[in-house]
UniProtKB/Swiss-Prot annotation:
Gene3D superfamilies: GroEL, GroEL-like equatorial domain, TCP-1-like chaperonin intermediate domain
EC number: 5.6.1.7
Keyword line: ATP-binding, Chaperone, Cytoplasm, Isomerase, Nucleotide-binding
UniProt cross-references to CDD domains, sorted A to Z: GroEL
Role this protein plays: Together with its co-chaperonin GroES, plays an essential role in assisting protein folding. The GroEL-GroES system forms a nano-cage that allows encapsulation of the non-native substrate proteins and provides a physical environment optimized to promote and accelerate protein folding.
GO terms under cellular component: cytoplasm
UniProt catalytic activity: ATP + H2O + a folded polypeptide = ADP + phosphate + an unfolded polypeptide
Keyword Cytoplasm (UniProt): yes
InterPro entries: Chaperonin_Cpn60_CS, Cpn60/GroEL, Cpn60/GroEL/TCP-1, GroEL-like_apical_dom_sf, GROEL-like_equatorial_sf, TCP-1-like_intermed_sf
Protein name as catalogued: Chaperonin GroEL 2
Organism: Prochlorococcus marinus (strain MIT 9312)
PANTHER family: 60 KDA HEAT SHOCK PROTEIN, MITOCHONDRIAL
Amino acid sequence: MAKRIIYNEQARRALERGIDILAESVAVTLGPKGRNVVLEKKFGAPQIINDGVTIAKEIELEDHIENTGVALIRQAASKTNDAAGDGTTTATVLAHAMVKAGLRNVAAGANAITLKKGIDKATEFLVGKIQENSKPISDSNAIAQCGTIAAGNDDEVGQMIANAMDKVGKEGVISLEEGKSMTTELEVTEGMRFDKGYISPYFATDTERMEAVLDEPYILLTDKKIALVQDLVPVLEQIAKTGKPLVIIAEDIEKEALATLVVNRLRGVLNVAAVKAPGFGDRRKAMLEDMAVLTNGQLITEDAGLKLENATLDMLGTGRRITINKETTTIVAEGNEQAVKARCDQIKKQMDETDSSYDKEKLQERLAKLAGGVAVIKVGAATETEMKDKKLRLEDAINATKAAVEEGIVPGGGTTLAHLSPILKEWADKNLEGEELIGANIVEASLTAPLMRIAENAGSNGAVIAENVKSKPFNDGFNAATGEYVDMSSAGIVDPAKVTRSGLQNAASIAGMVLTTECIVADLPEKKDAATPGGAPGMGGDFDY
C-alpha cells in the first residue's frame, strides 16, 4: 500500500492534534468533580464511565497521522495502568502539557535531543523527591483513604477495600464479581491466585479485557504434558453433556491438543480454558495437590496410578469462579474449609521439620496462597451501565491501595507535583544549563497541569489555585470537593507514591518521543468508491480527508 510521508514541524503538529483530542476527552474526568464520558457500543447499551485508560482505548480517529498521536499518548495511560493500576488520567494530562510546552520550544529552534536530556534529568530528580516525601501506610484507615480517592470519593468503597485487606492480608487476593442486589457486599472465601495465565489468548471470554471468566467450572489437574487430544476425549465428552465449563491446569499442552481445545472453544462446543501449572519439579506437584484440596478434586498423576484417559467427573475439582488473564489465574472455591485447614497444618509441620531456609520460604509461600483465601467484592447497582462504571472504579481503588502498600503515600489531588515544581526549578537552575535547562523548565511548567485541571473541573480558576498551593507548606493543597485549602493528609486526600511516580515517568517518556519525531510514515487514506450514491458530481474519487 502507498504511504504518506510527513516531515519536521508538520509531522509534530499532526501528532499534537491527535494528542489534543485524546487529552481533552480524558481530562474532563479528572478530580472529585470530573464529568463522565459516554462510549457508544455497537451492541447493547452505551457505557458511561469515568476511567481514563478505558476512554483512551476507545478513541480512533479518521486521520491516520492524528491517530498516531492518539496511540502515543494512549501508551502513557496504559503503561501507567500496567505499572500502578491507577493514575492514567493524570499521566495523560501531564504528557499533554509537556508535549505542548516542548513543541513550542522546538518550533522556536531548540534542539529536541538536548531538550529530551533535560526532561529525563528533571524526571529522575523528581522521582527521587517523590520517594523522599512518601510516607509508609501504617493502618487500615490510610488504606481506606487511598481507596476512597481512587474510587472517585466513594467512602463506602474505600472502607470495603480496607476491610478486605484486613481479612486476606496486604498481599491477599481481592476479586470482583457482579452482585445480584443493589448493594455492594464483601465476602471472604477459600481460593488462591498463581502467576500463570492462559496458554492461548483464544480462551478469553471477555475480549475487551482479555480475560477468561468461567463460572462454576470443572477443574482438571494433571502433572503430565498433554500431547494427544485422544487422552482428553473421554473426559471432554462427559463434561460436554453437563454443559459446564472446564479449566485444564497441566504441565503443558502441546500444539495438536491445544488446537483442538481452541477450535471447540471458538465453535461454542465447549467452554474451556487451559493454563500451565505454576512452579517446577516437586514444587509444581505440591502446588497442584494444594489446588486439588482447595477444589475438592484429585491430581491425576501416574504416581497414584491415575491416567487421563480414565478420568471421570468425580475426579475433577470444582470452583465457584475462575478468572484467567495473560499473567495470572484466580480460583475462587467454596465449602472445603476442613480439607484446606488440614492441608495448611500439614504444610506448617513440613516447615517445622525442614532446615533449609529456601524450602521454608517456598512452604511459607504455599501456606499464604492456601490459607489467605480470596476476598470477593460483589458489585451492586441499579442498572448494568452503572454496574460497569462501579466495577472500573473499584478496580482502580484496589490497584491504588496495593500500590500504596508497596511504595507509600503522598499528598493527593495534584498537590505533590505542584509543590515539587519550585523545588525542581531551584535544582535545575543550579545543575543544568542551556537547552537541558529549558527541558527541565518544560517539566517544571507541566507539573501544575493535573492540579489546574482538577480545579477547572470543579469550576475554579486553575492557574490561581496552582499558584496559591505552591506558596503553602508541602502537605497543604486544594480540596476540589469543598473548594477549600486543607492539609491533604489530614483530609484523607492521598495518592499512592507509585501512581504519581509512574504517571510522571510515562508522561516524560512519551513527551520525549514526540519532541524528537522528525518524520511520520503512515498509510495513505483509501479512495472512496467512485460509484458512491448520493455524492455530488465529480466527487466520487475524493480522499477521506
